[in-house]
């Protein structure tokens, strides 16, 4: 063997020894620093984590996870542009696994979203979905994006996909988007299209009350008071708390139609379904009082008080009904009771 051959052989042996003994130690050191970075992130010490991550990529430029974490921390610190630069540089690396590509696109979507570049954020999410079309995070990100952009058709479409991925049904969410779409059409003067959209919403979820509020309002504009009343009543029955806000609308529409007697029947239906609805109950008592049925009105209020002694609303209604028939000392006692309740509520 010639001297040059011997020298080459020695160099090869030295190189091999370097690879098998020194390289693993270097790799072990790099992973140890990366672990320190992750621990710092868990503690919330982002500055230390960032320092460790920078040390990692100096020692190992192929450590993609470290680059990803660096970019994510920079974004969280408010430096989305620097995060984009790091994350974007990873997209051209060859032979990346799908889960790494998914992480890159997710990070870029969040980067762009932070600086309100929504079109680019959407593009990254769509690239992610090409790798994993059932990715729940990506679909929910798109849903939030479409809601922000008030694109109700796409929001409805994505909502259906999410429900399929989650293996659940949420007709209320679909109905909500349809109602928002209908409201947009109404604002643009497309009344008939709005009504059709609201009707679809009602079929999608018959218990989503806002549909009927919108239908009632739109039929009022069309002066179709019969349909307006029907839909408002559905709203009031489904949403007793907010339904009281439209009692005056229903009364006015019934009076316009000359259907005075139906005001009493309307409040009776509300009270029958929800006996604790004091707003409807006092309205009904007022109607009975106006008809001269004083005793029936008083009996109605007293029945409500037997179930809820602390209702100031009911006590005031009883006081109103008692003014002309009760003795002064009885009225005084009743007023004292109301003052006591008011004082007690204020002290709480």
Residue ranges, per PLM feature:
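Canonical tetratricopeptide repeat
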Residues: 69, 103, 107, 141, ...
């Amino acid at each position: 063997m010639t001297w040059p051959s011997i020298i080459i052989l020695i160099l090869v042996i030295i190189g091999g020894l370097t690879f098998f003994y020194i390289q693993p130690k270097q790799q072990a050191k790099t992973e140890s620093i990366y672990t320190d970075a992750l621990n710092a992130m868990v503690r919330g010490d982002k500055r230390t984590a960032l320092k460790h991550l920078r040390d990692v990529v100096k020692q190992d430029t192929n450590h993609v996870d470290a680059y990803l974490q660096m970019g994510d921390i920079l974004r969280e610190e408010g430096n989305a542009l620097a995060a984009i630069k790091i994350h974007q540089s990873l997209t051209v690396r060859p032979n990346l696994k799908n889960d790494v590509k998914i992480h890159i696109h997710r990070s870029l979507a969040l980067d762009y979203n932070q600086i309100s570049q929504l079109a680019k954020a959407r593009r990254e999410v769509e690239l992610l979905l090409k790798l994993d079309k059932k990715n729940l995070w990506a679909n929910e990100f798109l849903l939030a994006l479409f809601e922000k952009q008030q694109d109700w058709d796409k929001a409805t479409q994505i909502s259906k996909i999410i429900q399929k991925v989650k293996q659940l049904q949420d007709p209320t969410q679909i109905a909500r988007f349809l109602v928002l779409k209908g409201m947009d059409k109404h604002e643009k003067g497309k009344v008939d299209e709005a009504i059709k959209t609201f009707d679809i919403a009602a079929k999608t979820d018959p218990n989503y009350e806002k549909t009927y509020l919108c239908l009632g309002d739109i039929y009022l504009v069309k002066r179709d008071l019969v349909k307006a009343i029907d839909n408002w009543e559905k709203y009031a029955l489904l949403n007793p708390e907010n339904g009281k806000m439209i009692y005056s609308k229903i009364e006015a529409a019934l009076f316009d139609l000359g259907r005075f007697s139906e005001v009493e029947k309307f409040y009776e239906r509300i009270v029958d379904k929800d006996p604790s609805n004091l707003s409807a109950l006092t309205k009904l008592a007022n109607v009975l009082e106006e008809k001269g049925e004083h005793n029936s009105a008083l009996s109605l209020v007293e029945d409500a008080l037997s179930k809820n002694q602390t209702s100031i609303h009911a006590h005031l209604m009883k006081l109103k009904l008692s003014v002309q028939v009760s003795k002064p000392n009885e009225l005084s006692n009743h007023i004292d009771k109301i003052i006591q309740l008011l004082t007690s509520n204020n002290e709480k």
